[in-house]
Amino acid sequence: VTTEAAIQVRYPKMMLSVLMAGTFTGLFGETALNMALTNLMSQFSLSAGQAQWLVTGYLLTLAVFVPVSAFLVRWFNTRVLILTALCVSLAGCLIAALAPGFAVLLLGRVIQAVGTGVILPVMMSAALLIFSVYQRGMVMGMVGIAITLAPALGPTISGFIITLFSWHAIFWLSALVYAAIILLAVKSIAPIGDITRPRIDILSLLLSSAGFSGIIYGLAILAEHSLRDPAVWGSLLAGFSALPYLPAVRRTWRCR
């Protein structure tokens, strides 16, 4: 077994640290607004269901863009893709921080989730490619900690921030973190993988997006509705029905 990494980059540790920081900040944002939902309901005159969309919308966007990023890394330079995703997440935080109403706040959340959905899979790929096989166990352990710790800490940290300031401060803080990450990324991020520009398997993308989105949406609204509600079981049924077709579609696509 070779002791060298599959792809040699100048700053592998710094590159992975930047990707982990970007992913951590994005996944922190996934749950950070949970503690502010009551305040937002009062400020914007929202129902509980409407306010919940600020969380559900983020999750649905992740469910769509994580599979899409598998194609993006084969179509675009990885360095450009990562920097763009970080800038998109930064823009989303700024929009949310300045949001005058619910619609703009939701838009900012979705835009931030787009960047997170791209960075997360790239980080996983980079962890496997820029480190040797002997280092991968430790590296993947660190990646796993970042992925699980960020959403767990979101409500705790954001609750402290809201107590001292307001919900706007959550996004201002995230924006500052993203800005620092971008500055480090300019120096440390290197391209990984080849740009092959394969044909885009639209059907697989649609099936994966529908499958994961349906499951996430169904589970999200289950908190307020009975399992007998058509919106709940219909979403779950659509999601679980779409995913089993993915392997067959992928095999058919490769045979073309």
Report residues per predicted region.
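Short, Lys/Arg-rich, polar N-terminal cytosolic tail immediately upstream
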Residues: V1-Q8
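Hydrophobic transmembrane alpha-helices of multi-pass secondary transporters
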Residues: Y11-L27, Y58, V88, V104, ...
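Extracytoplasmic
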Residues: Y11-S69, I119
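Hydrophobic core positions of alpha-helical segments in small-molecule transporters
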Residues: V18-A21, L54-G57, T84, L107-G108, ...
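Short helix-kink/termination motifs in transmembrane helices of multi-pass secondary transporters
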Residues: T25-A36, T61, T78, I170, ...
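Residue-level hotspots within pore-lining transmembrane alpha-helices
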Residues: T25-G29, I95, A99, I111, ...
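Helix-loop-helix hairpins in multi-pass membrane proteins, especially solute transporters
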Residues: V66, A70-L203
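Hydrophobic transmembrane-helix bundles of small-molecule transporters
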Residues: T163-R256
